[in-house]
From Swiss-Prot:
Family according to the record: Belongs to the class-II aminoacyl-tRNA synthetase family.
Record protein name field: Histidine--tRNA ligase
Reaction equation(s) it catalyzes: tRNA(His) + L-histidine + ATP = L-histidyl-tRNA(His) + AMP + diphosphate + H(+)
Main location: cytoplasm
EC number of this enzyme: 6.1.1.21
Presence of the UniProt keyword Nucleotide-binding in the record: yes
Organism annotation: Dictyoglomus thermophilum (strain ATCC 35947 / DSM 3960 / H-6-12)
Amino acid sequence: MNLGIPRGVQDILPDETPFWHLIENTARNLFEKYNYEEIRTPIFEFTELFIKGTGETTDIVMKEMYTFQDKKGRSLTLRPEGTPGVIRAYLMNKVYATTPIWKVYYIGPMFRYERPQAGRYRQFHQLGVEVLGRKDPYIDFEIINLAIEFLKTLELENLEVEINSLGCTKCRPAYREALKNYFSQYKDILSHIDQERLERNPLRILDSKDEKIIPLKENAPQPLDFLCDDCKNHFEKVLNYMKEADLSFKISPKLVRGLDYYTRTVFEITTTSLGAQNAVVGGGRYDNLVETYGGPSTPGLGFALGIERLILLLKQQNKIKIERPSLIFIAIEKEKYVKKAMEIAKTLRTNYRVEMGSPEESLRTQLKWADKLNSDYVIFVNQGIENNILKIKNFKTGEEKEIKIKDIKELQHIVL
């Protein structure tokens, strides 16, 4: 039997999970202060959901999805991103009928067949927020500010917002046509995939990793030059809110993001703390996505980040400090003292982690357990307990003392 695991997945062992708890708890506490509520959607959906929403010309749909057929021949896909499932839940449950503004966040595993590298896996975990029902520019600012506040709460340094506007259904067609005309000049050097994108969605060529295409992108038309008055006004207001909040940003005219549904505001948050520029968060508006799925006209926007990548960055910056309650080991001399040991353990667990020994093992064996568990203290439950006396040993310094207790609750705070 092969006890290995497929490439691109990992076990998250107990010594790593405190990092995950820190990020997840920080997100929940902060997002809920901004009136976001948690949503949990299935990890697999009908494949059509992602083809229609994420976009059939995106790298995700064309190259990276884990798609399979169930026993009845229906095409299912492990979710490669979180937004389509949230929109599907919004429509299927008719949330729009009772909730004009819906603010949700999600935390969970996603799946993409891409080349594994540091901080990137084929099963990875995303944390994201979505807002449905608001088209005003302030909410664009709010989610960018929320992402920044979240990263700063985790003490991630040297953050910069890169922002752009892709326009709307009124002004986007002219930009698409300009892109198509520009790249058509170089059709002979485009890959087969990029030639297909040229005809179906030329914006996706801007995502191309083909080395022959990268220099061509430098002189490609920019969406900001094609914005209609409404989109210009919207974008200017977003930028003004960011200035008023003293959020530094850089307008990046070539930023388009890798998903087909984005409209107007798109952004990435990067950090340069590690030398090379690293994207940490990405997001934007998707004002037509709900309609794409057959729902009512509903503006929307959101952002997402990869938890594995964030943990890697925080570790490299030495920003993750995990503090766990002291571990107290209770060594039990005889079977008749087990009940009293249980009472002591119950009281101590108010403030500490507690591991119980066993009277069926010698004291020497129990102390070996305590050592291997890296215990901070050992409490000896022996004959002394009959006189309300406990011996406590600081397992780090070796210091010992006896304490007389009248009430087990006196043990809730041990100082030695």
